[in-house]
């Protein structure tokens, strides 16, 4: 069973990975693949099953590394909507991952 805190930590790591994706790609040839890629793949597979608005906000926050303010402006939502959507993202992953275990 995965906790909400674990999901939040993994999402932070995913965001970090995407913010430095080129560095990770360059290091792959000389060092090898970092373990974060397995986490990224797992989360990306799960988010594909999310409702469209949850998916859209996930991409903006975690793949494109936007702040809440930048995501709100880019997507045409309020900052509070993005904040609430991020909670829905965490809840979505929590439910999906804990159903896998059950």
Can you say where each PLM-predicted feature lies in the sequence?
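Residues within the DNA-recognition helix of helix-turn-helix
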Residues: 85
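N-terminal interaction/assembly modules
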Residues: 1-49, 69-70, 97-102
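Short amphipathic alpha helix immediately N-terminal
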Residues: 49-66
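Generic hydrophobic/packing signal
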Residues: 42-46, 58, 81, 89
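Helix-turn-helix DNA-binding module
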Residues: 64-81
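Secondary-structure boundary/capping signal
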Residues: 54-58, 79, 101
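C-terminal flanking helix
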Residues: 90-98
């Amino acid at each position: 069973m995965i906790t909400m805190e674990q999901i939040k930590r993994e999402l932070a790591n995913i965001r970090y990975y995407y913010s430095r994706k080129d560095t990770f790609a360059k290091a792959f040839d000389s060092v090898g693949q970092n373990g974060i890629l397995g986490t990224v793949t797992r989360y990306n597979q799960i988010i594909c099953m999310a409702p469209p608005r949850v998916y859209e906000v996930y991409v903006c926050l975690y793949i494109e590394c936007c702040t809440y303010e930048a995501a709100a402006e880019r997507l045409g939502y309020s900052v509070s909507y993005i904040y609430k959507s991020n909670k829905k993202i965490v809840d979505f992953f929590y439910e999906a991952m804990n159903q896998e275990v059950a």
